[in-house]
From Swiss-Prot:
GO cellular component, one term: plasma membrane
Organism of derivation: Pediococcus pentosaceus (strain ATCC 25745 / CCUG 21536 / LMG 10740 / 183-1w)
Gene that produces this protein: yidC
Signal peptide span: 1-22
Chain spans, region Disordered: 253-279
GO biological process: protein insertion into membrane; protein transport
Designated name of the protein: Membrane protein insertase YidC
Length: 279
């Protein structure tokens, strides 16, 4: 499932890049038609403008608050994704045992492997596909945000700090921050996983995803990059609260030490019992 989620993340960025290069440039107004332009993008635009007015017409703050609201809305899904990820990480030793048991590449062995994996997931209450939902939801949100900013005149002309929201960040500060917070988010998630569940792909993606975000953000409007900065910063805070890796590692180590102590106590009791029988 971890590989699937990472592939979905890369696919999302690639799909967004493709979509944004081919999207319509017609202005978004109250006369826009269709479900996408007339309903989704238009209402995104209106909501961001409304939020901006609460901050004295500052469209950057409008996008920041909009992003936070989106993250709060999908928070239940993110919590579910986090719990699913943690359960899957705990299953890795058993999944590896199954892979070794059905190491043959013939069709029958691979079918049995899939069946055993599905059985294991079902017993643990894990849905491998559920972890992809937040990624799937956020892609159209980013696309709609891009369309709202680039095709609504007041947002297109909006500024925030040194930024023209419809243009790239001239000083590359936002792309660097977006990549940094992406790295922090993936690194914290990796730290919470059992040591045996990590592999070369995990480490590669910890550094690979921030690089993809950096390269993409360098070529995207500041509004989209600002969204990435805020959403990944939110993710860092969410991880520290819900999936704190330092707390999880401590609890995992305490559990290991407790189990070791129990085994030692059992062995000690057995030795005492053997001595008593000899007497």
């Amino acid at each position: 499932m971890k590989h699937l989620k990472r592939n979905m993340a890369l696919l999302s960025v690639a799909a967004l890049s493709f979509i944004l290069t081919a999207c319509s440039t017609a202005p978004i107004t109250s006369h826009s038609t269709g479900i996408w332009d007339g309903v989704i993008v238009y209402n995104f635009s209106r909501f961001i403008i409304y939020l901006s007015k609460l901050f004295g017409g500052n469209y950057g703050w409008g996008i920041i608050v909009f992003t936070i609201i989106i993250r709060i809305i999908i928070l239940p899904l993110m919590i579910y994704q986090t719990r699913t990820t943690m359960k899957t990480a705990e299953l890795q030793p058993k999944l590896k045992q199954l892979q070794q048991k059905y190491s043959s590449r013939d069709a029958e062995s691979q079918q049995k492997l899939r069946e055993e994996q599905q059985k294991l997931y079902a017993e643990a209450g894990v849905n491998p596909m559920a972890g992809c939902l937040p990624l799937i939801i956020q892609l159209p949100v980013m696309y709609a945000l891009y369309a709202a900013v680039s095709r609504t005149q007041v947002l297109k002309e909006g500024t925030f700090l040194w930024l023209q929201l419809s243009d790239k960040d001239p000083y590359f500060i936002l792309p660097i921050l977006a990549a940094l917070f992406t790295f922090m988010s993936t690194w914290l998630s990796m730290k919470s996983q059992p040591a045996g569940s990590q592999n070369g792909m995990t480490s590669a993606m910890t550094f690979g995803m921030p690089l993809v975000i950096l390269i993409t953000a360098l070529n995207f409007p500041a509004a989209i990059t600002l969204y990435w900065v805020v959403t990944n910063l939110f993710q860092v805070g969410q991880t520290l609260i819900i999936q704190n890796p330092f707390k999880i590692q401590k609890e995992r180590e305490e559990k290991i030490q407790t189990e070791k102590a129990k085994r030692k106590a059992i062995e000690k009791a057995k030795r005492r019992a053997m001595k008593s029988k000899r007497k």
